Curated annotation (Swiss-Prot):
Membrane-side (Cytoplasmic) residue stretches: 378-380
Region (CH1): 5-103
Native source organism of the sequence: Ictalurus punctatus (Channel catfish)
More details: During differentiation, B-lymphocytes switch from expression of membrane-bound IgM to secretion of IgM. The mu chains of membrane and secreted IgM differ in their C-terminal segments.
Pfam families xref list: C1-set (PF07654)
Keywords assigned: Cell membrane, Disulfide bond, Glycoprotein, Immunoglobulin domain, Membrane, Secreted, Transmembrane, Transmembrane helix
Protein name from the UniProt record: Ig mu chain C region membrane-bound form
Region (CH3): 209-309
GO cellular component, one term: plasma membrane
C-alpha cells in the first residue's frame, strides 16, 4: 500500500572536486511504491537548486530505495551554508537539512629539540619542532629569533596522518653563531585555527650531570625500587639505562624500568629513573648499575655509571670510561669511591618530586660526612 516517505538520509562528499564543487545527496528507503516520487533541493535562501540528479528507484528488502544528489559550490559548503533536501509523493513529504559539520579541533602537543654541541662545533645549529597529535590538517609553523620571523630558514616540513590525526615536523637550520651569540631564545610556534602553542630554547654552556643512585627501603613485598637521580645537566637531552650483573635490563625477565620527563629548573635539567626489581634478586647480592649518557660527557668517557648491591662491603666503582681512543685528546680516569654502608627507611611518594629531591640531598650529605676516602688513578 502506497504511503508517504518515512525516512530521508543526507550524505555529502568528503573534500571537494577539482572544479570547486561538492556533491550532496539524499537517500529515501522502505517505500511501498516509487510512483510519483520526486526530490526538491533548496539553498539557504529557499531558492530551488537546478543541478539536481534523481536516480531510478531500486527494489530491495523492505521496499523501494531512491537516491538524489545535487552539486553546490565548495565555497558555499565550506562557508557553513545550509541546504535542504525534500522527498515527496502524492501522500506526503519528508525533508532533511545538510550543513557541513564543525570539525573537531584536536590541539597538538609540541616538542622542540636543540642542536648538539658536536653540531655547533661543526658550525651549524639544527632545531626540530614536532607537533602531535592534531586535527584538522590545516596548521602553520612560525619560527622567530630576537622577535624576527626566520621561517624562511626552514629546511623541511613533514606531515603524516594516522587514524584521522596528524603529526607535523618542521626543521630549522641556522649557523652556529646565530644560535650561540643570540641573547634571545629560538621560538617555534604551532598555529591552529583556534589554538596556538609554542616552545622556546635558549643557548647555554653544556653542564655535566650529577648522578646519585638510591637504594630501596627495606620491604617485605615481592619487589623493591631502585632510583637513579640525574641532576643539573644541560642541554636537556639525556639517556638513562640500567644493568643487572653487567646485563642490560631488557634482557632480564621481570624487571620494569620507568624514566620521568625531563624537569627544568632555571635552565638546568633533572630526571629520575626507577628500576623495579624482584626482592629476591636484591637480597641475593646482584649488582645493579645506572648508566647516564649526555653530550657534555666527552666521547672518550661516553657515560657515567653508579652501581649498588645490598650486601656489598667493597668500594663502589664509578666507571667513567673503558678505553682511551688514540683520536681522543682527554685522559682516562678511573675513580674508586669507598663509603660506609648505611641503612635507612623512606617511603617514596611518586607524586611528590620535591620530597624525593630532598631525600637525595639528605643522602648526598650523609655520604659526604661518612666517606672514608677517594682514590683517583690517572692513566696516561
Amino acid at each position: 500500500v502506497q504511503s508517504a516517505p518515512k525516512s530521508l538520509f543526507p550524505v555529502w562528499q568528503c573534500g571537494s572536486a577539482s572544479d570547486g564543487l561538492v556533491t550532496l545527496g539524499c537517500v529515501t528507503r522502505d517505500l511501498a511504491s516509487a510512483d510519483g516520487l520526486s526530490f526538491i533541493w533548496k539553498d539557504a535562501s529557499g531558492s530551488a537548486l537546478t543541478d539536481v540528479v534523481q536516480y531510478p528507484a531500486v527494489q530491495a528488502t523492505g521496499g523501494y530505495t531512491s537516491v538524489s544528489h545535487v552539486r553546490v559550490k565548495a565555497s558555499d559548503w565550506n562557508g557553513n551554508k545550509k541546504f535542504t533536501c525534500e522527498v515527496k509523493n502524492g501522500l506526503g513529504s519528508k525533508d532533511a537539512s545538510l550543513q557541513k559539520p564543525v570539525e573537531r579541533e584536536l590541539h597538538a602537543s609540541l616538542l622542540l629539540t636543540t642542536p648538539t654541541q658536536t653540531e655547533i662545533d661543526n658550525g651549524t645549529a639544527t632545531f626540530v619542532c614536532l607537533a602531535t597529535p592534531f586535527s584538522p590538517k590545516s596548521h602553520t609553523f612560525k619560527w622567530t629569533l630576537e622577535k624576527t620571523d626566520i621561517s624562511n630558514k626552514v629546511k623541511e616540513n613533514i606531515v603524516s596522518q594516522n587514524k584521522g590525526n596528524f603529526t607535523a615536523i618542521s626543521v630549522l637550520e641556522l649557523s652556529a653563531s646565530e644560535w650561540t651569540s643570540s641573547t634571545s631564545p629560538v621560538k617555534c610556534e604551532f598555529q591552529q585555527k583556534n589554538h596556538n602553542v609554542f616552545k622556546e630554547a635558549s643557548y647555554g654552556n653544556p653542564e655535566f650531570p650529577k648522578v646519585y643512585l638510591l637504594a630501596p627501603p627495606e620491604s617485605s613485598g615481592e619487589s623493591v625500587t631502585l632510583t637513579c637521580y640525574v641532576k643539573d645537566f644541560y642541554p636537556k637531552e639525556v639517556a638513562v639505562s640500567w644493568l643487572v650483573n653487567d646485563k642490560q635490563v631488557e634482557e632480564v625477565v621481570g624487571y620494569e624500568q620507568n624514566t620521568t620527563a625531563v624537569i627544568d629548573r632555571n635552565n638546568l635539567f633533572s630526571v629520575y629513573s626507577q628500576l623495579i626489581i624482584k626482592t629476591a634478586d636484591w637480597n641475593s647480592g646482584s649488582v645493579f648499575s645506572c648508566l647516564v649518557y649526555h653530550e657534555s660527557i666527552k666521547d672518550c668517557v661516553r657515560h657515567i655509571s653508579r652501581s649498588i648491591a645490598k650486601d656489598s662491603k667493597t668500594p663502589t666503582l664509578v666507571n667513567l670510561t673503558l678505553t682511551n681512543p688514540q683520536s681522543c685528546s682527554c685522559s682516562t680516569y678511573v675513580c674508586i669511591w669507598s663509603t660506609e654502608i648505611f641503612h635507612y627507611e623512606m617511603e617514596m611518594d611518586d607524586d611528590n618530586m620535591a620530597n624525593t629531591a630532598l631525600t637525595f640531598v639528605f643522602l648526598f650529605l650523609i655520604t659526604l660526612f661518612y666517606s672514608i676516602g677517594v682514590t683517583v688513578f690517572k692513566v696516561k
